[in-house]
């Protein structure tokens, strides 16, 4: 019981103590976090919570732990690793890095890494070990090894050269560090190698062959050359094409060039290039500043050679001959260079229009050209006399000669303008390459048309004159060349060809003047000898042809329209053209433009005569001329009547009696021609026309292509056996002509020999059959018709 009370008293005492004791206050974790966040928001507390949210850390503690981590990791740590070690957000790490770098000068931020000077010192020690082992290290290799940027490494290592690193960096190429021993060794190798070189050598080939460090070699080589230890020069700088030229080679080279120029008087650019001189022209200008040289396209020549050429040209001009300067020049000089040299010499002579340059190298004096022209004088007069008898050359009037003179002046002015443009263009290029200037004309021709039968400038000339030049030529180029060869024995072929081309125009112009003068003298002496056709003779001849045309037109009407068209065209081209030419030639005689044979008058000549006629006569004659190109005989005859009236020519119309006489005379003429001919085609033609006249009592003027239509028409006019014979003979004639054409068209192919033999057999067989039938065909007209047909 006592124990129970003791326990009660004890509990009472504890209760009393509890009642009078002070109570202790405690906060929950949530309340604590809320209070801290409010303090941070009110900026009364600066702390950072960790990534797991269980701890708070002050910025100062972050900086302290970052320094500790940098020290622990050897002076180089990645900020990502710091974030993982300190267990805070990366933003807080980056914020503290700036403060650390500012406050501690020995710490740097490089590519997201903190690096201190201790780390760089250890890195420099490692680099020095490698350098002493290999003799050189490159920044590029160190960048790969230490994963650091090149500029940072170069700066860091440069600061430690001579203190930690025993070596030096190449000033021209800061990407390599050498030891003194390495540089000395390479310097000795370079000095020895380049001292042994005696000819230009590409530096790049030595680098690849002997394993030199490229930048070190260029630096050492430049140093040795500047110090005079190596005698030579480096051409091309520090490039792949850099070349080392030793002084001994340059001296030998210069000696050779001086000797060659002194002995030969010229220098070839290619020869200097083969000696190893890259820019020959610049080299020559630099070496021979005071020497007078003429620069050509591929060479330069001295004044002595220029004087020699000038003397030869001057002598040729003064003596009235020609000279080719090519033999005077070195054979290695091209024709183009020779031409440039000659142009320079011609300008220096200052003799206006005293010479002409042919083939780029041949100088011909004007006197020599005039002498060549005089060689043709006698031949011109002989040919002019002959032309007067055969060709209508005297249709060249005073006006034509004036037009020719205009053309010549136009050509000359055009050529002078071209020469002037060429001279200005070449002089503006900076080298002595002008043309002949005002003292010489350079003459060139196209080689594609040697014979010169068609003038290349004809279109250009005709545009100025509006009319054609007279179609009369003294000689063609090949003929002039042959003539000149007989008189110029030693002249080059090309010179003769160009000289002939040059002489064509002046010779033709002179010839036209000679022809005109010959005609004028001949017409004045022959005016009283009856050369001019009398009006009576003309009226008789024109009337006869007029009546013949009427009779031929009557015979045409037996045929179809197509055949009539062909016969009309043939009649207009032949008989109608003849009568037109008679009328035109009669009028031309009054203009002193008549010809001996009116058949030689062409359409162009008729147009020329028309241009000289009075307006009244021109209208009627123009219609007559144009009617030859129409398709109607009636229109032509109507125009002929008008023209005859305008010319006071009286046409005598035929009567029945006269028509019978004309028919008889025409038949007799055809019969006489048939008797003597041996040509099968002509025999068939004459026989068909005669049979037509016997059957229809009408004349027919037909071309050979209308013979089949005539034979077809005769089928109802002559006995059947005679027509059959005529058709058979026609077939043989056609077969014979076709065989001959095939034989002519075949080439010399060996495979066609057998065909040639067969063709020859066919021709021989056909010819034999024609010979056998020819007499029978002729007898259809010559014998049988004597008894069966009578015609008076």
Swiss-Prot record:
Cellular component GO terms held in the UniProt record: cytoplasm; cytosol; endoplasmic reticulum; endoplasmic reticulum membrane; nucleus; site of double-strand break
Localisation per UniProt entry: Endoplasmic reticulum membrane; Cytoplasm, Cytosol; Nucleus; Chromosome
Region span, Disordered: 412-471
Ranges of compositional bias, category Basic and acidic residues: 453-471
Entry keyword set: Acetylation, Chromosome, Cytoplasm, DNA damage, DNA repair, Endoplasmic reticulum, Membrane, Methylation, Nucleus, Phosphoprotein, Transferase, Ubl conjugation, Ubl conjugation pathway
Modified residues (Omega-N-methylarginine): 433
Predominant cellular place of this UniProt entry's protein: endoplasmic reticulum
Chain positions with N-acetylalanine modification: 2
Modified residues (Phosphoserine): 458, 752
Annotated region described as Mediates interaction with CDK5RAP3, given as residue ranges: 488-682
Residue ranges, annotated region (Required for E3 UFM1-protein ligase activity): 2-212
Disulfide bond annotation, renumbered to this chain: none
Residues bearing PTM Phosphothreonine: 534
Family affiliation: Belongs to the UFL1 family.
Assembly mode: Catalytic component of the UFM1 ribosome E3 ligase (UREL) complex, composed of UFL1, DDRGK1 and CDK5RAP3. Interacts with E2-like enzyme UFC1. Interacts with RELA. Interacts with NBN; promoting recruitment to double-strand breaks following DNA damage. Interacts (when phosphorylated) with YWHAG/14-3-3-gamma; sequestering UFL1 and preventing its association with PDCD1/PD-1 substrate.
Name of the protein this chain belongs to: E3 UFM1-protein ligase 1
Name of the encoding gene: UFL1
